[in-house]
């Protein structure tokens, strides 16, 4: 992947991580105690983990050449939207998106798995 794309994706991952941290902070003060707060906490935690996958993947894409990087980023983004998004909505009393949660969870797992495959099977770009 071209370096400028890796840098752009790295910036997106860092921005999403900041948003996850902000969501966690806001949720701990604004969401009522109980199941709603637990759902919000879980959403922000996995939002952060998926953002971290994007950050790590973007850095690794600068070191190993592979065609798997973009799908791994896509899966992480879909995972954040579906898994964390459905839990954020659930904590606000909106349960219509609940069926998307498992899909999002699988996408986050797929993202991490693809990162591992890209590193294992990718060509090291730092060697001459």
Report the location of each language-model feature:
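Short, charged juxtamembrane terminal tails flanking transmembrane helices
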Residues: 1-2, 123-128
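Membrane-helix boundary connector in multi-pass membrane proteins
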Residues: 85-100, 118-121
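Juxtamembrane helix-break-helix junctions at the cytosolic face
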Residues: 58-70, 91-94
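Non-cytosolic membrane-interface motifs at loop->transmembrane helix junctions
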Residues: 37-43, 96-106
């Amino acid at each position: 992947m071209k370096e400028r794309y890796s840098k752009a994706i790295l910036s997106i991952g860092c921005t999403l991580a900041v948003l996850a941290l902000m969501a966690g902070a806001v949720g701990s003060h604004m969401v009522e105690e109980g199941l709603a707060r637990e759902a919000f906490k879980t959403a922000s935690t996995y939002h952060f983990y998926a953002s971290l996958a994007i950050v790590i993947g973007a850095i690794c894409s600068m070191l190993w050449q592979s065609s798997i990087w973009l799908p791994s980023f896509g899966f992480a983004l879909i995972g954040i939207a579906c898994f964390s998004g459905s839990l954020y909505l659930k904590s606000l009393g909106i349960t219509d998106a609940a069926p998307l949660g498992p899909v999002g969870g699988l996408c986050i797992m797929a993202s991490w798995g693809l990162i591992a495959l890209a590193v294992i099977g990718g060509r090291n770009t730092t060697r001459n």
